[in-house]
From Swiss-Prot:
Function as written in the Swiss-Prot or TrEMBL entry: Histone H3-H4 chaperone that plays a role in maintenance of chromatin structure during RNA polymerase II transcription elongation thereby repressing transcription initiation from cryptic promoters. Mediates the reassembly of nucleosomes onto the promoters of at least a selected set of genes during repression; the nucleosome reassembly is essential for transcriptional repression. Essential for viability.
Name of this protein: Transcription elongation factor SPT6
GO biological process: one example: positive regulation of transcription elongation by RNA polymerase II
Biased composition (Basic residues): 75-84
InterPro entries documented for this protein: RNaseH-like_sf, RuvA_2-like, SH2, SH2_dom_sf, Spt6-like_S1, Spt6_acidic_N_dom, Spt6_death-like, Spt6_HHH
Any Pfam family matching the protein: HHH_7
SH2 domain boundaries: 1256-1353
Amino acid sequence: MSDQESASLREEKNEIINGMGSGAPSDEEEGEDVFDSSEEEEEDDEDEARKISEGFIVNDEDEDEDEDDENVADKKKKRRHKRRAREEEDDRLSEDDLDLLMENAGVKRPTTEGSSGGKLKRLKRVGDEVESGAADREQESSQEKESSRLNDFFSDDEDEEPYDEENRERSRGSREYDRGESNHQGDNRKSGMLDELDDFIEEDEFSDEDEETRQQRLLERKMMREQRMKAPTKITGLSSDKIDEMYDVFGDGHDYDWALEIENEELEGGDINEQSEEFDEETGMTKSSKKKISLQDIYDLQDLKKNLMTDEDMLIRKTDIPERYQELRSGLVNHGNLSDNDQELEKNWISEKIAVDKNFSADYDLTEFKEAVGNAIKFITKENLEVPFIYAYRRNYISSRERDGFLLTEDDLWEIVHLDIEFQSIINKRDYVKRFYSELGISDPLVDEYFKNQSTGSVAELNSLQDIYNYLEFKYAQEINDNLQKESDKSGKKHLKNSNYEKFKSSALYKVIEAVGVSADQIGNNISSQHQIHIPKDHEALKPLELIELVLNENAGDLQVFLSNIKLAMDTIQKYYSWEISKNTKVREKVRADFYRYYLVDVVLTTKGKREIQRGSLYEDIKYAINRTPLHFRREPEIFLKMLEAESLNLMTLKLHMSSQKQYVDHLFQIALETTNTSDLAIEWNNFRKAAFTQAIEKIFNDIAQEIKDDLEKTCQKLVCKVVRHKFMTKLDQAPYVPDLKDPKLPKILTLTCGQGRFGSDAIIAAYVNRKGEFVRDFKITENPFDRSNPDKFEEVFEDIVQTCQITAIGINGPNPKTQKLFKKLIEVIHKKNLVDSKGTHIPIIYVEDEIAIRYQNSERAAQEFPNKPPYVKYCIALARYMHSPLMEYANLSPEELKSLSIHPFQSFLSPEYLNRAIETAFVDIVNLVGVEVNKATDNSYYASVLRFVSGFGKRKAIDFLESLQRLNEPLLARQQLITHNILHKVIFMNSAGFLYISWSKKRQRYEDLEHDQLDSTRIHPEDYHLATKVAADALEYDPDTIAEKEENGTMSEFIEFLREDPNRRSKLESLNLESYAEELEKNTGQRKLNNLNTIVLELLDGFEELRNDFHIMQSEEVFSSLTGETDKTLFKGCVIPVRVERFWHNDIVCVTNSEVECIVNAQRHLGAQVRRPPNEIYELNKTYPAKVIFIDYPNITAEVSLLEHDVKNEYNPLTYSKDPAIWDLKQELEDSEEEKKVTMAESRAKRTHRVINHPYYFPFNGKQAEDYLRSKERGDFVIRQSSRGDDHLAITWKLDKDLFQHVDIQELEKENPLALGKVLVVEGQRYHDLDQIIVEYLQNKIRLLNELTSNEKFKAGTKKEVVKFIEDYSKVNPKKSVYYFSLNYENPGWFYLIFKLNAESKLYIWNVKLTHTGFFLVNYNYPTVIQLCNGFKTLLKSSNTRNRSGYR
């Protein structure tokens, strides 16, 4: 094995020990063309690929070293050109691919060799040509200048400079031709288009030029640029003075041209390192004269990351693989390069995972299902097709042939995408373990048998592979050390393993294990076969202790430590014997299989959990959970995630065990190690073996329990992720709001909010948004809609707004229930004033979901869009936009805003990774269902936000796509231009083309002869265009000869036009027998296209028909929750809530909750009726009382409540979980309840009568309760409480920092009685007259001094250990400087540490500083300020040093 392979193995080993290793894929791996099977470059081995990916130059010094210098230079030149050619070829279509694309698009591609090259020109109308001539000349100049703009870093030109240079030459010629031949431009456009398409694959006109010629060409090009830069700048409408002033402020846009010029030259000639190589004749080596300049040399790396412009980002942009796949596979090596056997294993492995949730019957034949899964895997891994494409255009390959059979859903496909990554990790680890085993040069029957079984059976799991690896490390530590020793001799580094087991194995004590009578391997065989193949043999004469004594006596010199402690020797032998058993893979495999099959989960409460988990707690439903099975967690995955969360908070521990676990262990012992003899000798040896075996099994149980917890957590995260994803999809899956479904035009919208609802003092804000979603204007309605003195004024203003803007829909929402009052008023005005649309229908008014508007009104995006508008105007704009498109509104939220959405109650249990997955996959599915209009996205950043979710795209590719479109400087006319203009490459085009559409109606008005423009506005994929034309021809019932003629002439698209114009097209299309047509097509071509045919028929009837659900109108319960913030968990019938008395109405009482829900207390629901007194004599205004909810009126946002004592005491708390004794520990619950009652009674007995002090800061707390109360408060907050020292003491508890509180004692003197407040209060020897004086003169001074110190630059936050480490590190970096910092003393609240070092060599000193109400006390002196404290410290230090020096003299 080579040194390089050994080094690689060592690196992989370090990664594998802690899980699957990760490594960045090379450029060739990431950028390999999946359609190109060419392997011309056989000399480029893996080492070269890796070096290239790392940015190094491959020096082929080992090839042809005997050739002369000239041959070496020629070879390098040829190799550079060959690499450039190959890089261009990888991203371009082959001739066959282009022919196929043109054929599917209905364009017949000529084969003549003299066709002109260049990009597809914009088609012009005849009337526009003369006007465009001058514009073209100006455009040429502006485009050349544009090349130096910073945003062109995203340009595709970086990778295709030779191609662009050639295009510039051709473009210049084309423009000159256009100016000179304008009279001939009305000729056959179709022919011209075909000529240009024919030259899509460029020929490298510089392929044969030598280095000197190339340098000359670059020099000429540079001179041309300099001439252009020297030319005077003309800007229409600006004088030269204004232009100069503008340049002074903004620059001329060429500040970074030096870097771009170098980069352009690099791209022109390939790798800049290669370009700058010089051949040294003396050494025979190449030397580099320049350093490659990248974007990181110009911009800050953080800015590049923020704008997705790092080298990794640019690589993802250019690699012709879907961006989401690249991100998922970034940690894998050689993804997709599986053997045929591994591919079959992957299909079976993933099929088993997916089938779990399909509920197939036990006798269901999975053959067809596995075939469908295999097809999906092939599409994902081999063809790099994303889920939306597979589901839309390959559905017949992932479903049953039976009509009511299975179908792999989008959920299944996304799961397969991630399972493929997991499987690749398993295979990588398996291959590593195989190489590791092979390098050891040993043969272990157990390992050999394991890999033999894995090659013929199902794939190994990571856990079993880890077992093999751990087994090898444990058993063959010496061989590993020998191998490492050989490598260290070569590299000079030593990383040898220190194995205690090897030391024990070489000692005399190991003889006792050999005498046990059955080895670990034999135990593994017995357990694996469930039969005692190897029968244990007891020692002939000696018991275990006797044998140990004998061994110790015979080896007293080596084992002296055990002579006086034979028990230690016994324990040591049993420990290592148990290790041998626990590392045996057969034992672990059997125990793991049984444990996974029969395990149960119990909750074991901690003391903290018993105390804190009470009724109403989040963890109430799992407090006494027992015997929970895997099936329970699959049905309710959130339960296990909740358990893990509670465990992390130290509220409980999870105990995983097998049912009848003790009996199981006894059974294994009987078949593996127990002898049937009944003699005392046999009993002793059986006891010895069982003790060791029990230790081994317990160790295995613990390991497997942790494995199960990890696996179960991942499984439950996936299941909850699916639930959250579906819930979020319901939010996205809404069509725009349309008042009249028969006339589906977007409405002109007026949205309103009344803010806090203070009518008459606060204005009502409204915003008008037109049909295009553009904000037009806002309105501020100051008139009070409920003004009784002038009720018509508001109505007139509102009517005028509606009539002026011609509003067709009204939306409303707000932050409180006052909005409902306005809503009812607006309905009244609409009917009273008869405000109707053009069809005479009353203008609808609806509540609009405002979760996005709430986030938008104060967002950075809103500030950029509408910097001068108040928040409520922005709120209304967002409401209107939501009515136009909920999808667009959600898509424009930032990642942080998306995560803050309340999607589902269980989303808090998801890790950020799974939450992001749920959100992104939901976006991808819905966006591709809707489609994206390409030209609209080009100049509308709001609309373009959905591009990143198009199949094959991502954030980076969406940016690249938009910049490529913008460089065209003209609308895209056909999908085929995405290929012919080099905007997309093969794989991304295949993924995205069907979801990117071009509006045909607009295009037809300007461009009449472009082929297949009508199909470009449908969901029909370009690969099916030819099939669509045949469907149209069959529907029109043309004879085969006519169809064949048009097919031969390339005019099949005419059938589409004929069909569109046919008034009976629906009946003709629906009469087609698509099933038989699909069968015939599959028989002839092998393609399964039934679903595609159905799509073609639907799209020919109505291209990109709206497939989303109707806009969701908020129901009364949702409106109630939106305006009040209450949910069915916080406000429900039977619950008890606090209400504030607002007014009295006859014998009723009107109250209000904290959420402003109006509550009515009827006369029979309060004490007034019982004592026959009016309620205002019993209840006080503005006072809060507990009330029980009797009824909730959701439409009117009111409730009926009761203030009666017996109602309040009988609160209804519904039990939402099962207390079935089979899964709930009733016995433990009862015991804990009794214990809690005892503790409560003991505490109540110990408590004295609570003192009541008439002061706003006095609370009936003890010390712990005071700390808990202040924990969420700010620094400096405090409470006054009763002291534990007796009735003549009080205490102040105040907060110094997070989880840091000081308790200050107050002694009371001159008390009138034990419960009265003393007339004199003493704090730290200082006398005060009342509590307020203590607060002002003592406590507030301490708070001020605390804030002064903590805000000083010499204060360091953190623990003592952290501050000490910081000072030590600082001192090492600055060895000659002294350093000191203050930090909080968490062990003694009210004290600070003063930590300092004089220099790097001195010891670390820690002094204590006390915080007083007059300053800081340090070394017998009080310093009033922090500055004086620092100066005093320095003075003390200086005097201390002086004394030390004088003492040495």
